[in-house]
Amino acid sequence: MKNISILILFLISYTSCTQKKELTYEEEIEKFQYELNVHYSDKKTSPLKGTDFKKFKELPFFPIGATYKVVANFERTPNEPIFEMPTSGPRKPLYTQYGIARFTLNEKELSLRIYQNQKLMLDPEYATHLFIPFNDQTNGNTTYDAGRFLDLEIPKGDTIVIDFNKAYNPYCAYSDGYSCPIPPKENDLDTAINAGVLYTDKH
């Protein structure tokens, strides 16, 4: 859980930094990819173990595509109950559904449920953090078969930016011993999201 929190903190800090600097979109994503590789290269934060860590050079990514950065309509769902998020292990973290994002991508009308971790929201560093676990038609082919994750910030208005170029694999893709959230059926996207982190030969 500690390493996962560090990864989330990196992603939040990264988003804040890029908002302060005038980077091109491609530079923004390249910096995100670089920092994610740094995270995986650091023995203190990497989910990789043993030989996998020693052999690690960099994560593979889809080509950067602005098409996969979408501005979605955002509906808050304030009356949703707290629930135990199913995971791949014994851990059952508490979440609420914070809202629903609706958008068009690859000529399809799609939607994603967005969640808030009840423990993290009590920490000032993560108070505005939102989480999307999702599946798409690349699972088991070019991406991890158990889905990918996105981290976002609570928006101020009724839209939210979802950038699939920042989609990443759960730690379970790289090592045993983690309890990773399982994307709900509602977040199965009926399209191929050819963006974000690839999954080949464990890296």
Describe the function of each predicted region.
Residues 1-24:
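Bacterial Sec-dependent N-terminal signal peptides
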Residues 20-79:
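Start-of-domain marker
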Residues 66, 106-110, 158:
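Short acidic/polar mixed-charge low-complexity motifs
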Residues 74, 114-118, 136-138, 164-168, ...:
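A mature extracytoplasmic/lumenal domain signature
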Residues 78-145:
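Mid-length scaffold segments of soluble, non-membrane domains
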Residues 119-127, 152-160, 201:
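Short, surface-exposed linear segments at secondary-structure transitions and domain or protein termini
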Residues 131-168:
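Acidic, glycine-rich flexible loop segments
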Residues 168-203:
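Extended, aromatic/histidine-rich regions of cofactor-dependent oxidoreductases associated
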